[in-house]
Amino acid sequence: MGHNHNHAGGSNKKVLLISFIMITGYMIIEAIGGFLTNSLALLSDAGHMLSDSISLMVALIAFKLAEKKASHHKTFGYKRFEILAAVINGVALILISLYIIYEAIKRFSHPPEVATTGMLTISIIGLAVNILVAWIMLNGGDTKNNLNIRGAYLHVISDMLGSIGAILAAILIIFFGWSWADPAASVIVAILVLRSGYHVTKDSIHVLMEGTPGNIDVTDIIHTIEETEGIQSIHDLHIWSITSGLNALSCHAVVNDQLTISESESILRKIEHELGDKGITHVTIQMETAAHNHDNTILCQSQTENPRDHHHH
C-alpha cells in the first residue's frame, strides 16, 4: 500500500549505518577526552553523542524489524516499533539533558581546572564529524517525513551546536580565564537536547495515541470523500498513522441502495486515488445504505455505549 515505502527504507538504513559507525567512534574519543581534560562541555557532548549512537542503533533495529512480514499475531507487522524507538530516544534525551544541567549547576560554584588545549582540539574534530554526518543524512535520508531519521538528524544538529559550544568555552577559558564558560556551554547544549527530546517524544506519542497525522487536513478529507459522486454521507471516520509516512483511513459511507458492486468498486477506486494524492495510502471504506443502523456523527462517538450496541467497525 505505502508508495515507495521500501525504497526509502533502504537508503535510510544505509545512512543510519554510516552515521552510527562515525558517531560511535567519535563518541568514545570524546568521552575519554572529556575525562582526561576534565571538561563538562565535552562530557555533556559525549553524553549527547551516546544517546545519538543508541538512537541510531535503535533506529537501525527498527528498520530491520519493520521489514518483517505481518503475521496472524501482528497484522501490521513491526512497523510501529520505529515509533516506539523514537519515544525511547526522546525520553533518553530529556533525562540526559536534565542530568547535564544538574552537573553544570554544581560546577558553577566549584569550577574545576580544565585542560583547554585538549578540549579545543577534540571539540573541533567533533564539529567536523557532526557536519559530515548531518550532510550524509540530509543528502541520503528522509529527514522530513521519517520520524526516526528526523530524530537522529535532530540529535546530530544539536550535537553540532554542542561542539560549537565546547569550542567557544575552550577559547573563553584560554583567552580570558573564564572557567564558568565550561558549565555554561554544557547548560546551553542541555537546553537544546531537552528541546529536541521534547519534540520527538511529543510527535511519537501523538502517533501511538492514534492522533491525526500533522500533514492531513481532516476537513479537506471529509469534503473529498463526500463530494465523490455516489456518496451521500460518511460517518465513523478515523485517520491515523501506522508509522512514519504510512497513513491510514477508515470510515463508513452511505450510498444509494440500488448501487451495483461494480459501481461501488469504481467509487472506491476514485476515492482511493484522491486520498493517495493527499497522503493517505491505506484506505478502508465500508459501504452501506441509509437503512443500515448507524450513528450520524462523522467522528466516532462510541466511547460510552455498551459494546453490544456498538455499530460495526
From Swiss-Prot:
Residues 36-45, 102-117, 181-313 are cytoplasmic. The keyword Nucleotidyltransferase does not apply. It comes from the Bacteria. One of its GO terms (molecular function) is zinc ion transmembrane transporter activity. It is a multi-pass membrane protein. InterPro entries: Cation_efflux (IPR002524), Cation_efflux_CTD (IPR027470), Cation_efflux_CTD_sf (IPR036837), Cation_efflux_TMD_sf (IPR027469), CDF/SLC30A (IPR050681). The chain crosses the membrane at residues 15-35, 46-66, 81-101, 118-138, 160-180. It is found in: Cell membrane. GO terms for cellular component: plasma membrane. GO terms for biological process: cobalt ion transport; potassium ion transport. The keyword Protein biosynthesis does not apply. Keywords: Cadmium, Cell membrane, Cobalt, Cobalt transport, Ion transport, Membrane, Potassium, Potassium transport, Transmembrane, Transmembrane helix, Transport, Zinc, Zinc transport. Residues 1-14, 67-80, 139-159 are extracellular. Pfam families: Cation_efflux (PF01545), ZT_dimer (PF16916). Involved in divalent cation and potassium homeostasis in the cell. Catalyzes the active efflux of zinc, cadmium and cobalt, in exchange for potassium and H(+) ions. Belongs to the cation diffusion facilitator (CDF) transporter (TC 2.A.4) family. SLC30A subfamily. This is Cadmium, cobalt and zinc/H(+)-K(+) antiporter. The gene is czcD.
